[in-house]
Amino acid sequence: MTCLVVLTGYSWAMAGSYDDFFIAIKNDDVRLVSQLLHRGFDVNTLNSEAEHGLLLAIREPSPKVALLLLGTEKIDVNPRNRSGETPLMLASIKGQTALAKQLIDKGADVNQPGWAPLHYASTYGHLELMNLLLEHHAYIDAASPNESTPLMMAAMYGTASAVKLLLEAGADPMLRNAQGLTAFDFAEKANRSDAVHTIAAFMSARTPKAIEPKAAE
């Protein structure tokens, strides 16, 4: 009977800890999260929406808690939300370069099938983060499920600077997605004149110039 009471009390305590943990993450309450982890709460526990605490901390954002979670030994740095996004992908959306670097240092996947962090950073024109990903061997022409590349995303949604960065780093402007569209087509479709001019200038500069034939003597 005593054992049953102890176990029941433990289950109620853990239920309370479960709620407290995710509320504390949302509130960026690093003190409470730290206390719960020291009591043995599993850092990789998912919330009621099957979302990992690290994903929640980055999405909120709750930067202090995110750093605390990253510092734990058993943290999973590659969990996915229901949309298939990882912590590094969310950090790439928000342009959180310092956090992205820590994620990479802990083993976060820079390359993965489908949408990749570089797609996200390029979409939002986060140049510093784009450079970080490329320095860690992000595949520059990564293909999304519809075969769109980071350059295409930058051309349609990002900035001319993001387009220029990718082109100068070796992105292929001639690639086409599943709809047969190139990065230039993306820029035109979105009425992005700055991206159109950037891609056109790059293509023109790399096109071999015709050599004028010498006049017969």
Task: Cite the ranges covered by each PLM segment.
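Ankyrin-repeat-protein effector appendages
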Residues: 13-20, 136, 169, 178-181, ...
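Ankyrin repeat structural motif
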Residues: 29-37, 62-71, 96-104, 126-134, ...
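Bacterial N-terminal signal peptides
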Residues: 1-9
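Ankyrin-repeat boundary/"N-cap" motif
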Residues: 16-21, 46-52, 80-86, 112-117, ...
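Alpha-helical adaptor scaffolds
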Residues: 111, 115-135
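Ankyrin repeat A-helix N-terminal signature
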Residues: 23-28, 56-62, 90-96, 120-126, ...
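Intrinsically disordered, low-complexity regulatory segments in ankyrin-centric signaling systems
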Residues: 9-41, 48-51, 67, 71, ...
